[in-house]
């Protein structure tokens, strides 16, 4: 398999070189983002958005620790610490702290004040614009959370007797599909929603806090209509006094490759059967232009595929079928799914409809007309790039930045994006797109059926037989497909 991978990579580079856009140039970070690292290791990133004067000021503090750093005896510590933080005034007087949290909440886009996951803890504040006093208080509060919490039996008991405002990612860590996806991963034994073991030892929570809440493992992000230089100075003054340094690296969360199985999972997450045709591959960080162009090509191929299937279903007047497409990065595994919403008794028929279209695209590709329409649409979107950017509010900009950091993607300036994207669209051909589609559709795929609780379990063997009859290639085609197995870059989305 190593040889296959190497052959493929060489083939991909030759294909891109023939289009004239392989470059090893490092992507240049968007200079609109001011960023730095304090002497104690804390990283900060600030974006001033004068084009959005009425938007709220978004503040995020990410601590690179979560439930994966807990031992069995420490279960629940990573969830308990922010609970304790939310019941303390954080260096402010009690009235100031109350006011900060009342105003630091966007009623239009409510977000939990803290989200704990396997590898991170995220503190969220959304402040009214033109309130520099509140921003100063928010930074004071977060700096206090970062290294000055009071953890005693009394403060722990007070926190545990108060309402739990700390959310987890994912929101339901025990949901059936999620537990299935974690099989074979160390994450399965480190649930961020796990309660504290009794009796609670405050001294052990304090030791855990001091070990993992160190400034060199923190990133602070501020986005809004602010004076970036003034905010940077305030960050240095407020956070610069924090002490501590990581002596033990945090475990890196990993997922096992998605198994190409056909499974039915009962869950409360759906009200109607949802069948997902799913594949996953290693996510490749995007730090240089050639990687970005490879990602764009794979991404555009997937979008073209979705357009094609939707149009064919509409043309054939398909009933009782809903179609969705979803790509995301989960702990550096890129996962994509074609989701079919269907009544239980139409599942086999609807899978057959979609699989037939997938097989046609894999074997014959998209038509020149479809390709031309897609590129025209993308060129139109590119012409509106700056208008779109100006309409993007601070909440969205902050979320995009968080995802880029998480997925190791360099954010580039709109001007650089426009230039690279235009060159990419001008160089793209229908043959290149069809080759990429062939590669993606020749991978082994899983059939994951989510069923509402209480529904009779569907016969997955029947679905698998339908799929195999249409999609499993002949022996000769299978060999060709294996040699074309893609180096994959998948669509980033919110964890």
Curated annotation (Swiss-Prot):
<dbReference type="GO" id="GO:0008237">
    <property type="term" value="F:metallopeptidase activity"/>
</dbReference>
<dbReference type="InterPro" id="IPR007863">
    <property type="entry name" value="Peptidase_M16_C"/>
</dbReference>
<keyword id="KW-0378">Hydrolase</keyword>
<dbReference type="Pfam" id="PF00675">
    <property type="entry name" value="Peptidase_M16"/>
</dbReference>
<dbReference type="InterPro" id="IPR011249">
    <property type="entry name" value="Metalloenz_LuxS/M16"/>
</dbReference>
<dbReference type="GO" id="GO:0006508">
    <property type="term" value="P:proteolysis"/>
</dbReference>
<comment type="similarity">
    <text>Belongs to the peptidase M16 family.</text>
</comment>
<keyword id="KW-0862">Zinc</keyword>
<dbReference type="GO" id="GO:0046872">
    <property type="term" value="F:metal ion binding"/>
</dbReference>
<protein>
    <recommendedName>
        <fullName>Protein YhjJ</fullName>
    </recommendedName>
</protein>
<dbReference type="InterPro" id="IPR050626">
    <property type="entry name" value="Peptidase_M16"/>
</dbReference>
<dbReference type="GO" id="GO:0042597">
    <property type="term" value="C:periplasmic space"/>
</dbReference>
<keyword id="KW-0732">Signal</keyword>
<dbReference type="InterPro" id="IPR011765">
    <property type="entry name" value="Pept_M16_N"/>
</dbReference>
<keyword id="KW-0645">Protease</keyword>
<keyword id="KW-0482">Metalloprotease</keyword>
<dbReference type="Pfam" id="PF05193">
    <property type="entry name" value="Peptidase_M16_C"/>
</dbReference>
<feature type="signal peptide">
    <location>
        <begin position="1"/>
        <end position="24"/>
    </location>
</feature>
<keyword id="KW-0574">Periplasm</keyword>
